[in-house]
Amino acid sequence: MLCIDCQTGYHAPYDRFERLAANPHAPSFLMRCRLCAALWNENSGVPELLTRTHARWLYPAARI
């Protein structure tokens, strides 16, 4: 279940996120909300809410 902040998107306060991994082939990072454990793909475009399956595919070395 997403927290209220994640329900409205990836936005400040950003200190609620922790970086789990970086994609060496693209400028993107796997971020996890400290409140609800939602996974986000932070990149140069619009951050994307990820399923665990999609996150494992994008970041195979990450501990999710």
Language-model features, listed with the residues they occupy:
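Short, non-ligating residues that shape and space the ligands of small metal-coordination modules
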Residues: 12-15, 39-43
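Residue-level signal for mature regions of secreted extracellular proteins and peptides
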Residues: 26-29
